[in-house]
Amino acid sequence: MNDLNAFTGLVRRCVEDYDMIAPGDTVAVGVSGGKDSLVLLMALSELRRYYPKPFALEAITVELGFDGMDFTPVAELCASLGVPYTRLKTDIKEVVFDVRKEDNPCSLCAKMRRGALCTALSGRGITKLALGHHFDDAVETFLLSLVYEGRISCFQPVTHMTRTGVDQIRPMLYAGEGRLSLIHI
């Protein structure tokens, strides 16, 4: 638990430095089922216990439509943390692979997944979406943009989505993969 406490301290610092959470916010964590999003969920759950700006926490998973995905462990973790959990069923897999037959599906899939998340959240009045991007992801995005696009670019700690009114927040930007690997789920 000590590693989670130290990690939560980094998350808190990032949240405060970029004013990511306001009193009364409901923060939805986009949970893929991978370690990054699960650790973020755990850290924000811990943070809400003592953070001076009270906020509610929810978890949401976009089901892309692939067979064999089991989100039971995610549901169990959410229940143990007292966090409401929603599974959003989509046909993203069908659109990306069967209709569009994308050769490089990652970008389209990511955009569609974020669009589905933001639309679902704005329909419920939730204006904050926490994503599990960390420092190493930011560096990788910066380098890929430089090499493949010839420009200096990276995602921001807070990104406002004008169409839906949802703010995407990235509270783990002060922590890298090495710090994440110390936390046991």
For each predicted feature, which ranges?
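Short, flexible loop segments at boundaries between secondary-structure elements
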Residues: 154-175
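Conserved small/polar residues in nucleotide/adenosyl-binding loops
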Residues: 183-185
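ATP-dependent adenylation/nucleotidyltransferase module used to activate substrates
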Residues: 1-143, 148-151, 178-179
